[in-house]
């Protein structure tokens, strides 16, 4: 976080981000300083964040929703290799597909005020556009990275 904060402190002309807020906290109990979020991304979640995005943790999604303004858009990207073979974080959840996400995950999300609008497999260009070091690292260890993208709105 220190490296990112240093870059953010630069002038906007040099890539600085005057509105960056770095927080070390859990998704289960996010700090109120993060309130008024207009767009929420959970890119390749792991551990408790992955369990929460799969519906195993019923507290996390409402907590995150409280931080968002009504109508905030969200993007969740799931690394499907977590099911090949299954890691403990996925529990008994079957590997999601676009169809099963809309059918099985949508009710979990709706209970917390999240509306799933679309679930689809991401192609190489979309994965590159995520531009995260974790996505690059995952992609470098296999011939093809299979990712399910889920989008929607919170508090609509």
Curated annotation (Swiss-Prot):
The keyword Transport does not apply. It comes from the Bacteria. GO terms for biological process: methylation; response to antibiotic. Its EC number is 2.1.1.-. It is an enzyme of class 2 (transferase). Keywords: Antibiotic resistance, Methyltransferase, Transferase. GO terms for molecular function: methyltransferase activity. Pfam families: NpmA. InterPro entries: NpmA (IPR056262), SAM-dependent_MTases_sf (IPR029063). The keyword Protein transport does not apply. Modifies 16S rRNA so making ribosomes resistant to certain aminoglycosides. This is rRNA methyltransferase.
